[in-house]
């Protein structure tokens, strides 16, 4: 009998419900206003990477037995392993080992399946260059010890930031 009255009440309930939802969203927004910013000034400040971070691959030439397991488990067949069979001792002698980080997807399969643990992931992630051919690392470049971000005093990490008085 009074469809207009019920529609008006329904409209009023919808208005109240919409105002409540807007209020809930606004309170969430205001609760985040008290938090400190997460942004860092990248070249001058760096975050400390986690233990399981997959950065540049470190290679130990003396441990490698040239078994080519890393090549077989790599989804893109990336590591290039050159070896020569020594007939007198019946073992492979590693001549060259290289990885092109311009193609590498940093999946970590080579590190995980290496039987001699000659490969390991480091925390280095700054591999950018102006020439893509510089990203092809041979065994000498891969054997370079990783520089820890924490030990670098020219870079302010989150642990080394000066305390601010609030």
Swiss-Prot record:
Q: How is the cofactor bound?
A: Binds 2 [4Fe-4S] clusters per subunit.
Question: Where does the UniProt entry say this protein principally localizes?
Answer: plastid
Q: Which UniProt keywords apply?
A: 4Fe-4S, Chloroplast, Iron, Iron-sulfur, Membrane, Metal-binding, NAD, NADP, Plastid, Plastoquinone, Quinone, Repeat, Thylakoid, Translocase
Q: How does it sit in the membrane?
A: Peripheral membrane protein
| Enzyme Commission code | 7.1.1.-
Residues holding [4Fe-4S] cluster 2: 74, 104, 107, 110
Would you say which domain of life the source belongs to? Answer: Eukaryota
Q: GO cellular-component terms in the record?
A: chloroplast thylakoid membrane
PROSITE patterns attached to this UniProt entry = 4FE4S_FER_1 (PS00198), 4FE4S_FER_2 (PS51379)
The molecular function terms in GO held by this entry are: 4 iron, 4 sulfur cluster binding; iron ion binding; NADH dehydrogenase (ubiquinone) activity; quinone binding
Q: Which cofactor does it need?
A: [4Fe-4S] cluster
Kindly state which reaction or reactions the protein catalyses.
Answer: a plastoquinone + NADH + (n+1) H(+)(in) = a plastoquinol + NAD(+) + n H(+)(out); a plastoquinone + NADPH + (n+1) H(+)(in) = a plastoquinol + NADP(+) + n H(+)(out)
List localization entries.
Answer: Plastid, Chloroplast thylakoid membrane
Indicate which residues the UniProt annotation says bind [4Fe-4S] cluster 1: 64, 67, 70, 114
* Boundaries of every 4Fe-4S ferredoxin-type domain copy: 55-84, 95-124
Q: Which family is annotated?
A: Belongs to the complex I 23 kDa subunit family.
**Described function:** NDH shuttles electrons from NAD(P)H:plastoquinone, via FMN and iron-sulfur (Fe-S) centers, to quinones in the photosynthetic chain and possibly in a chloroplast respiratory chain. The immediate electron acceptor for the enzyme in this species is believed to be plastoquinone. Couples the redox reaction to proton translocation, and thus conserves the redox energy in a proton gradient.
The record's PANTHER family line, in alphabetical order, gives:
NAD(P)H-QUINONE OXIDOREDUCTASE SUBUNIT I, CHLOROPLASTIC (PTHR47275:SF1)
Give the quaternary structure: NDH is composed of at least 16 different subunits, 5 of which are encoded in the nucleus.
Matching entries from HAMAP family are given as: NDH1_NuoI (MF_01351)
Its recorded name reads: NAD(P)H-quinone oxidoreductase subunit I, chloroplastic
């Amino acid at each position: 009998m009074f469809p207009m009255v019920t529609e008006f009440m329904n409209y009023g309930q919808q208005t109240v419900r919409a105002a409540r939802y807007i209020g809930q969203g606004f309170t969430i927004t205001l609760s985040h206003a008290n938090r400190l910013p997460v942004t860092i000034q990248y070249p001058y400040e760096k975050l400390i990477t986690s233990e399981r971070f997959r950065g540049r691959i470190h290679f130990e030439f003396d441990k490698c037995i040239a078994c080519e397991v890393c090549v077989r488990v790599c989804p893109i067949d990336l590591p290039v392993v050159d070896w020569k069979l020594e007939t007198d001792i019946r073992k492979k002698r590693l001549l060259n080992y290289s990885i092109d980080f311009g193609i590498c997807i940093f999946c970590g399969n080579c590190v995980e399946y290496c039987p001699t643990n000659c490969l390991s992931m480091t925390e280095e992630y700054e591999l950018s260059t102006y020439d893509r051919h510089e990203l092809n690392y041979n065994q000498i470049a891969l054997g370079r010890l990783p520089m820890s971000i924490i030990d670098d005093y020219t870079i302010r990490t989150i642990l080394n930031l000066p305390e601010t008085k609030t």
